[in-house]
């Protein structure tokens, strides 16, 4: 059964972007547009984690945190906010948030922080079973280890995020814009060849010993992870 995450933000574009990204990565996602709706949804069907904006109408994110913690609820909470001062971060943590992420942010970082929050609430053996595999390629989001067969591959943060997205969606064609949004974040570049450059890096590293290519170009669309060319 997939992990259920409740995303609470009054900005519809942010809600939908997070829904797409989290769903793409195997989470079951529900949406709320303010704190009152969020508390009602949590009371009726408690999720596994909460992604919570601070500035919202009716009931803001900090008050949601306070109300949950006052009842003894230890639901993992990741707070999002456009304010990034020390005092704002302290206020969020003091209200009961487990982690704090300022906007704008890279979706890659939000996913990493969510994995870290969930690891804290799961037994050790559950965390150890998160390795992702395709063909002879293995990626572990917990240890951040990547292997092609028995060969260890060292990746940068961006290379890892790109490969993680591909391996989470085997044989599914991912559009260029979708990859840019998820790996580079909301302020992703609309021009330039950053994506092509990083795909080239990944290919060189995953094919360094002459292994067959797994990352293929779908001309005019994007990229796909599969055993044979599309």
Curated annotation (Swiss-Prot):
Keywords: Activator, Cytoplasm, DNA-binding, Phosphoprotein, Repressor, Stress response, Transcription, Transcription regulation, Two-component regulatory system, Virulence
GO biological process: regulation of DNA-templated transcription
Signal peptide region: none
4-aspartylphosphate sites (modified residues): 48
Post-translational modification, as annotated: Phosphorylated and dephosphorylated by MprB.
Domain Response regulatory: 4-118
DNA-binding region: 129-227
Reported induction: Autoregulated. Induced by low concentrations of sodium dodecyl sulfate (SDS). In strain BCG / Pasteur, induced during growth in macrophages.
InterPro entries, per database record: CheY-like_superfamily (IPR011006), OmpR/PhoB-type_DNA-bd (IPR001867), Sig_transdc_resp-reg_receiver (IPR001789), WalR-like (IPR039420), WH-like_DNA-bd_sf (IPR036388)
Pfam families: Response_reg (PF00072), Trans_reg_C (PF00486)
A GO molecular-function descriptor: transcription cis-regulatory region binding
Recorded superkingdom: Bacteria
GO cellular component, one term: cytosol
Function of the molecule: Member of the two-component regulatory system MprB/MprA which contributes to maintaining a balance among several systems involved in stress resistance and is required for establishment and maintenance of persistent infection in the host. Functions as a transcriptional regulator that recognizes a 19-bp nucleotide motif comprizing two loosely conserved 8-bp direct DNA-binding motif repeats separated by a 3-bp spacer region. MprB/MprA up-regulates expression of mprA and pepD.
Subunit structure: Monomer. Interaction with each conserved 8-bp repeat requires tandem binding by two protein monomers.
Name of the molecule in the record: Response regulator MprA
Organism: Mycobacterium bovis (strain ATCC BAA-935 / AF2122/97)
Gene responsible for this protein: mprA
């Amino acid at each position: 059964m997939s992990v259920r995450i409740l995303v609470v933000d009054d900005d519809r574009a942010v809600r939908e972007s997070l829904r797409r990204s989290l769903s793409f990565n195997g989470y079951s996602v529900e949406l709320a547009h303010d704190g009152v709706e969020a508390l009602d949804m949590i009371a009726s069907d408690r999720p596994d984690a909460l992604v919570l904006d601070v500035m919202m109408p009716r009931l803001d994110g900090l008050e949601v945190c306070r109300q949950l913690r006052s009842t003894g609820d230890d639901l993992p909470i990741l707070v999002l906010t456009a304010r990034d001062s020390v005092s704002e971060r302290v206020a969020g943590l003091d209200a009961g948030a487990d982690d704090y992420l300022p906007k704008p942010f890279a979706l890659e970082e939000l996913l990493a922080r969510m994995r870290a929050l969930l690891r804290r609430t799961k037994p050790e053996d559950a965390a150890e079973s998160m390795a992702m595999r395709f063909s002879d390629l293995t990626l572990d989001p917990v240890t951040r280890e990547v292997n092609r067969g028995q060969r260890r591959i060292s990746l940068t943060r961006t290379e890892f995020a790109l490969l993680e997205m591909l391996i989470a969606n085997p044989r599914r064609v991912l559009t260029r814009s979708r990859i840019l949004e998820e790996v580079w974040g909301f302020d992703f570049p609309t021009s330039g060849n950053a994506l092509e450059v990083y795909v080239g890096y990944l290919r060189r590293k995953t094919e360094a010993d002459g292994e067959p290519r797994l990352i293929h170009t779908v001309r005019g669309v994007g990229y796909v992870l599969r055993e044979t060319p599309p």
